[in-house]
Amino acid sequence: MAKNITVDNFEKEVLQAAGPVLVDFWATWCGPCRMQGPAVEKLAEEGYNVGKINVDDEGEIAERYHVMNIPTLIIFKNGEEKERMVGVQSKDLLESKLKALA
């Protein structure tokens, strides 16, 4: 299951994580976000480091990373943003980007 990322654990779970971390910025009311959810959860089940940030609850993080549209998926590595995708993405595409940064 993807980790729920908050302002309290963002530093530890994302910025200080070993290896790449896929972060899904989403909201409960967002239809495309609900479509993206299963692919993100499947990657987490397969052992990839995946977190989800609810932009309504954690607006500070979304603002810090200039997330203007959702879903936005950002891959971080070594505390830095390495890849950003806006809109629904396939599991295969996300997995290939995570593998490339491993």
Give the location of each predicted region.
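Hydrophobic beta-strand anchors of alpha/beta hydrolase catalytic cores
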Residues: 22-23, 50, 73
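Typically the conserved alpha-helix immediately C-terminal to a functionally engaged Cys/Sec
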Residues: 32-46
